[in-house]
Amino acid sequence: MAAKQITFNADARMALKRGVDKLADAVKVTLGPKGRNVIIEKKFGAPTVTKDGVTVAKEIELEDKLENVGAQMVKEVASKTSDVAGDGTTTATVLAQAILTAGLKSVTAGANPMDLKRGIDKAVEVVVAELRKMSQEVQDKNRIAQVATISANGDKAIGQLIADAFEKVGKDGVITVEEAKGTETTLEVVEGMQFDRGYLSPYFVTNPDTMEAVLEDAYILIHDKKISAMKDLLPILEKVVQTGRPLLIIAEDVEGEALATLVVNKLRGVLKVAAVKAPGFGDRRKAMLEDIAILTGGTVISEEKGYRLENATLDYLGQAERIIVDKDNTTIVGGKGDPAQIKARANQIRQQIEETTSDYDREKLQERLAKLAGGVAVLKIGAATEPEMKEKKARVEDALHATRAAVEEGIVPGGGVAYIRAIAALDKVEVENEDQKIGVQIVQRALEEPLRQIAANAGWEGSIVVQRVKEGQGDFGFNAQTEEFGNLLEQGVIDPTKVARTALENAASVAGLLLTTEAVVAEKPEKEKAAAPSPGDMDF
């Protein structure tokens, strides 16, 4: 085990602060619409050019072990904020630095760090409550476009695309981001329910040009086991043939005699049919089959429920206006299920989303909800070069995340103004002693910092801008894009409430931990061992 270097008290805190400052100074130049770029050198490939705070933070690793501990703590602020809210990473870093800087001065002057932290925590609670009071709901497409535009660093085209995507699939829909083949950025919407299983035999194709099987006004047979014997399938097939309507079979697998008979009947024109494997695996497969059954008004023919395939009737089959099957995907459009049952199923999935602790499960549940409730939109990002593509894709993902946050918790005026308006509420905070009061004052000062930095990046004097905004009321603030003062909500300069809230909570949490640190244990840098002399250097 390598030897450790232990540092105490002021030395430890000052070393941590140096690390925090190095990281924060590199990150905060990106804040606001006039934020500057940071170029990140890569070991392989082209350098990355970014204006995204968390991307800069993640790349920073300091040589000094103690300083690096401080930098890593603040990096955690940025990435946690990005994970939860999708934006606000730079704001969180600026706030953490401001709280830590003011806090360390007070600790050095003799204040009790624990009381400072209690004061900071009380202040944050009050500010969060104030932000919630200020918050306005986001409903119309225009507002969604404004939120997305700001998160995408002022790119109106991206903002509009995201607003279109939300309009098409609703707030429960899934919106994914992919790289496009060309330079155009486009939006594709898949209506209905799509799952990633294609036809089991190319002989099921009805349109040889597109290699798709298209079934209009079709029945759907949903079975959770393999179908290999034709005798099991025959009774229901005969009933479907009499109706003259096409049939889609979804089962664990269709093989052997059953598959061969289906193909022969399809080729002879006796029955328009296609067969696909059931989506998913294990318990998720059962749940997805149940989703398809509810969406189409059918029943999963499962022996666990006491249903047998040979006894199936037309009442067990689901129905849909149109089904498109290609070699990779199946899309069911216009399922004829009972709307009340579909809604109840969607609510059940929403409940599971709230209760689950696994991010993976949550993502999969959200996909299922989207397929039931709205649909899936795919944003295909185009760019001229690889570095531009990466940068643009990261911006779109951020903007998407932030827009979801806005739809979830509402919006507040942007440009650091919401924090300025919350400062007054801190005058009334009840504290137990003088040090806690100092903690509250530290947060009051720190809340001005994001606006100062936005103004400074736009080439203005921060304190003059802060004073001018303080003199105004409500949504009055500084629009760094146009370099004018005015009503920020009307001008579309807005932040999701969740972003403003998460940035402050995470910043105060880490700054509070750093302030109450008394010792840091870090690995000692290993001394380079002298290389053994090579035989050529020896005298014989």
From Swiss-Prot:
Instruction: Please tell me where ATP binds in this chain.
Output: 30-33, 51, 87-91, 415, 495
Q: Give the Gene Ontology MF terms in alphabetical order.
A: ATP binding; ATP-dependent protein folding chaperone; isomerase activity; unfolded protein binding
Query: Which family does the entry's similarity section mention?
Result: Belongs to the chaperonin (HSP60) family.
* Gene Ontology biological-process entries: protein refolding
The protein's name? Chaperonin GroEL
Subcellular location(s): the record lists: Cytoplasm
Which HAMAP family does the record match to this protein? CH60
The UniProt entry's GO CC annotations, sorted and at most eight, read: cytoplasm
EC nos? 5.6.1.7
* UniProt cross-references to InterPro entries, sorted A to Z: Chaperonin_Cpn60_CS, Cpn60/GroEL, Cpn60/GroEL/TCP-1, GroEL-like_apical_dom_sf, GROEL-like_equatorial_sf, TCP-1-like_intermed_sf
Subunit structure, per the record? Forms a cylinder of 14 subunits composed of two heptameric rings stacked back-to-back. Interacts with the co-chaperonin GroES.
Upper taxonomic classification of the species?
A: Bacteria, Pseudomonadati, Rhodothermota, Rhodothermia, Rhodothermales
Q: Does the keyword tRNA processing apply?
A: no
Q: Which NCBIfam families does this UniProt record tie to the protein?
A: GroEL, PRK00013.1, PRK12849.1, PRK12850.1, PRK12851.1
Summarizing the function annotation, the protein's role is: Together with its co-chaperonin GroES, plays an essential role in assisting protein folding. The GroEL-GroES system forms a nano-cage that allows encapsulation of the non-native substrate proteins and provides a physical environment optimized to promote and accelerate protein folding.
Matching Pfam families: Cpn60_TCP1
PANTHER family assigned: 60 KDA HEAT SHOCK PROTEIN, MITOCHONDRIAL
Q: PROSITE patterns attached here?
A: CHAPERONINS_CPN60
